[in-house]
Design a protein with these regions (language model features):
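Conserved, well-structured interaction surfaces
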Residues: 37-41, 45, 51-53, 70-136, ...
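An aromatic- and glycine-enriched ligand-binding surface/loop that stacks and positions planar moieties
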Residues: 19-71, 172-173, 188-195, 200-314
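Alpha-solenoid helical repeat scaffolds
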Residues: 131, 135-138, 144, 177, ...
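Short linear capping/connector segments at secondary-structure termini
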Residues: 27-30, 75-79, 144-151
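Aromatic-lined, polymer-binding surfaces characteristic
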Residues: 132, 138, 142, 185-196
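Short coil/linker segments at helix-helix boundaries
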Residues: 138-161, 208-227
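Sec-dependent signal peptide recognition
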Residues: 2-8
Length: 316
């Protein structure tokens, strides 16, 4: 009888033994990400890859007429550029954003926390579509993830009003729901950054509609200008940001650009370099090294532009 009992107990222990499955250390599933605030925060960092890099600020105007170059890009050569050679028609960032919004629904996370991160996602969706509209004009509006057989993969362009109205809705949601109001690093999107982007986008859209009368959208110009004004006033009155004057009129402007860290009293969102993280700027290499190859070189016109700026801003 005892043998039977021992055998039965042993069998129960074997059947109820611990699982050998381990939690992956290098990857997570969807439920793991979306059921905690930390998971939402970690996912949201992927959106920042859309923003300009450290080097974009001094490299993006390489073909402007303030500099001399040894060669020209095809996009300014007559007959050398075409739709096939164009860039920017990538939708992977949008899919990443829409996937997040669709799945940020787990009630284990407080609703206000979820809305904060959805607001952040919609901020970046507005930024994505702003960049697309500036580059291409009319584009299709897509606010969900698409399968491989989805008809929207072959969708035509939506009207400018449709797309930009959705962009404004995204910006309004972001301004209302992003909870962060201060960031000591100057590298994260805050509520005030959302208002600033809203002001910039609305100003662009109002001006575009005003001067492109062929669109037939001049009736909405004042509305978009007013949206820009209200957003800018919010930043000026409520954000706490202001022009940096901490080192006097002679040194503050220079200090703003040579500081190791963003001067967050003025700078709202920065692309940061950090030697400890091996993230370094390359401006000196770009401008002074012969090993970088053919590149933009300043001419007297640019130098005079800077000198005129100093003349107009000098307190004397």
């Amino acid at each position: 009888m005892k043998r039977i009992i021992y055998s039965f107990v042993s069998a129960c222990l074997l059947l109820s033994s611990c699982s050998m499955d381990e939690i992956p250390q290098a990857s997570v599933d969807k439920d793991t990400v979306f059921r905690t605030e930390k998971g939402l925060e970690t996912y949201s960092y992927s959106f920042y890859n859309m923003l300009p890099s450290v080097s974009d600020g001094f490299r993006q105007d390489a073909m402007c007429d303030y500099g001399a170059v040894t060669s020209f890009d095809n996009f300014i050569r007559e007959g050398a550029y075409s739709a096939e050679l164009s860039s920017g028609w990538s939708w992977s960032d949008l899919r990443n954003i829409n996937y997040f919004i669709e799945n940020c629904t787990n009630e284990a996370v407080d609703e206000s926390v979820r809305n904060n991160y959805i607001g952040l996602a919609r901020f970046f969706r507005a930024y994505f579509y702003y960049e697309m509209v500036v580059r291409f004009g009319d584009v299709p509006w897509i606010d969900r993830t698409l399968g491989v057989d989805d008809e929207l993969l072959y969708a035509g362009r939506d009207s400018r009003t449709t797309v930009m109205d959705h962009v404004l809705e995204d910006l309004d949601f972001a301004c209302e729901n992003i909870s962060r109001t201060k960031d000591e690093t100057g590298s994260l999107v805050t509520k005030w950054v959302a208002y600033a982007l809203k002001s910039r986008i609305c100003l662009f859209e109002a001006s575009f509609r005003k001067y492109h009368t062929e669109l037939g959208l001049t009736d909405s110009v004042d509305e978009w200008y007013q949206e820009a004004v209200r957003a800018a006033e919010t930043v000026m009155k409520e954000s706490g940001h202001s022009i940096y004057t901490g080192e006097g009129t002679d040194a503050s402007f220079r200090s703003l650009f040579i500081s190791d860290k963003p001067v967050t009293s003025e700078v709202m969102l920065a692309s940061c370099a950090d030697a400890g993280l091996a993230v370094l700027g390359e401006a000196n290499w770009w401008w002074t090294s012969g090993t970088y190859g053919a590149r933009f070189s300043m001419i007297r016109t640019f130098v005079n532009t800077f000198l005129n700026c100093l003349l107009y801003t000098s307190p004397s």
